[in-house]
Amino acid sequence: MNFLSIDFSTDIGSLFIKIENKTFSKFLQSDKSPNDLLMKQIMDFFKENNLSLDDISGIFINQGPGNFSGLRASLAIAKGLSISKNLKLFGYNSFIWRCANLLNKKDSIYSLIKFRNKYFIKKFNKKLIGDSKIIETSEDEIIMNYDNKFKVVAKNDTKYFDERILKLNNLNLVDLKHKDLEFLKLNGLLDENLIKPLYLS
């Protein structure tokens, strides 16, 4: 599948295009890029790589959790492009993205995210189906209750995590790769209906 992936859930936004066996990526300082310029940045990204929207058949969009304005703007643009260009739209959240390479590998997986100085955790089963609601937790609770649980944290998030958490047992640091989203899609693990931002308090 040829696709565009948009992730503006964090301060560093990213765009990714896969066309056949070629991939193209770009990072943007999303907290310093006006949201009304996002559409232009996407079109410039295609143009820089001699591509057009006609080259893709779908869009993957990060629903969060994360930056409120970034999520809202990127989701609105993704929906607009999907409708105007008749492209399939697939939504994903940051919790399952961290687990993309663990399908059928662990009975229980705890995906950890830190957002606005708060820790959040979501449990998945071996089929990567959410076993629980998103739970807000603390450093001490994670250390006390999840030391022996199999946990995943994105490598680029480690700078935000307390060192005590990063030293816990069974902590798996993962790279977030846009191409893994196609794997999630092929296994029916992306949202296709009611795609909306995932906000955390």
Segments from the language model and where they lie:
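Oxyanion-binding and handling regions
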Residues: 1-18, 90-201
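N-terminal beta-alpha supersecondary unit
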Residues: 1-63
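DPxDG-like acidic metal-binding loop motif
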Residues: 58-94
